[in-house]
Amino acid sequence: IVYDKLNNNLPSFVETNTYFINSPHTVNVISIAGDQVDNLLNGNQIKPIGSFEIFDSEGVLIDEATGEFNEHGNDSWAYQQRGFDYITRDQHGYNYAIKDDLFREKNREEYQRLIVKAAANDNYPFTGGSPAHIRDSYIQSLSQVGNLRLDERSHESCVLYVNGDYWGVYDY
């Protein structure tokens, strides 16, 4: 290893990897990591840079990229599971997009932005309990299957890991 005494080192690529050991899943898995990503999800409204990996339910890597995370949603920020936007930035030198057919109802093959949310609309009007967190995605799916041609959002369920810690079931 060589170090520059004048500290003129060029920034290098950062490699992140997620490993699942005795952690089977039945839905896709999103793993995000970064120095400040958990601070964002703990309620600090910052825009950290971090890595994004998405795996299928068998644990096989679909794609990975580096980009920016920021707050998404209103109601979800009143709860511990918070939604966020992920924006792939090719300026970081890794990928310009997540390249895969991520949604069953769409034929699009790459995405520069994904919304990852905890279905907080099911918590309205803050009544407590343990809602199923499927109302919003269910209605969106009915609209697509029924070909209603409404302004709708595709969704898939996933499990989220943040810096290696399990954060729960989310939608993207």
Which positions does each model-derived feature cover?
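Phosphate-handling architecture centered on phosphoinositide signaling
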Residues: I1-Y172
